[in-house]
């Protein structure tokens, strides 16, 4: 698989590409599948439809990897927090974590309840071409914890950060509990058939450097170390969004580092490029305009050259991006990097 070879810095015939949120609302096929499911959460839980949605971008765009269609919040959901998705607002937990007692009341072994995810993986792997990789994923302990404490997305993360500074032992108990679940969750994804795993630390930038390293990065290192110990042949990709200023403190046992669009690739390459393959980082809104898209691709390829790079966006696809431009991006990257 070209994608897996690239994760391990092996020679590839061209630079592989996939896109975060490549299965999404910009595809009419996705809209139809979601309509059939009835809701976003039901789509995640319906393995047949989730498989359909996982495969769509590979078939339509020609990307080199599929990423499992699911949501990071299925883990806290199965740990006992009731979850709803409110239209135009996003996820909302009906109960939140407020103290040690509420951390202790969370169910252990939630990963055993996620058979709908593992079924989606095995179905997708059966239908996916042998040349294409399937990526599994989860959210980072810190990012999941913010949703569980705030109850929803947040601009300030005030409740989470208040807990971090005033009751760090409570937050650490939650992060530890989540880490143990996530190690087993990703292990079962691997056993079900994914070829690589990715951990999204979407709210990494909410923390100052020292707090980030202690309350997020340390847990990412713990998870990736255990996964590499168990499955050395499976690439681990970490994507901590918005920590470009902290790159000099990044270390650990993983293979690929996801660079967001706010971090110049030349900076990431200088600091991390010898240790890790880099993944990213086209500004997603460049896909609105072909000229802007071409300019962005040129800039990235000039910095990254032929090895140590997987092409991706620096964040997720937006719902109204023109699909023809997404397809063009894949063709352009393949053509420009063919060696």
From Swiss-Prot:
Q: Is Endoplasmic reticulum tagged as a keyword?
A: no
Q: What pathway is this protein a component of?
A: Porphyrin-containing compound metabolism; protoporphyrin-IX biosynthesis; coproporphyrinogen-III from 5-aminolevulinate: step 4/4
| MF terms in GO | uroporphyrinogen decarboxylase activity
Q: Which domain of life is it from?
A: Bacteria
Q: Where does substrate bind?
A: 21-25, 71, 147, 202, 315
| EC number(s) given by UniProt | 4.1.1.37
- Where does this polypeptide localize? Cytoplasm
Q: Where is this site: Transition state stabilizer?
A: 71
Task: Give the reactions, separated by semicolons, that this protein catalyses.
Answer: uroporphyrinogen III + 4 H(+) = coproporphyrinogen III + 4 CO2
Q: Which Pfam families match?
A: URO-D
Give a GO cellular-component term: cytosol
Keyword hit for Lyase: yes
Recite the UniProt keywords alphabetically.
Cytoplasm, Decarboxylase, Lyase, Porphyrin biosynthesis
Which one GO biological process term can you cite for this protein? protoporphyrinogen IX biosynthetic process from glutamate
InterPro entries for the chain: UROD/MetE-like_sf, Uroporphyrinogen_deCO2ase_HemE, Uroporphyrinogen_deCOase
SUPFAM superfamilies, alphabetically?
UROD/MetE-like
UniProt subunit comment: Homodimer.
Its function, per the record, reads:
Catalyzes the decarboxylation of four acetate groups of uroporphyrinogen-III to yield coproporphyrinogen-III.
Q: What family does the Swiss-Prot or TrEMBL record give for this protein?
A: Belongs to the uroporphyrinogen decarboxylase family.
Q: What is this protein called?
A: Uroporphyrinogen decarboxylase
Originating species: Helicobacter pylori (strain P12)
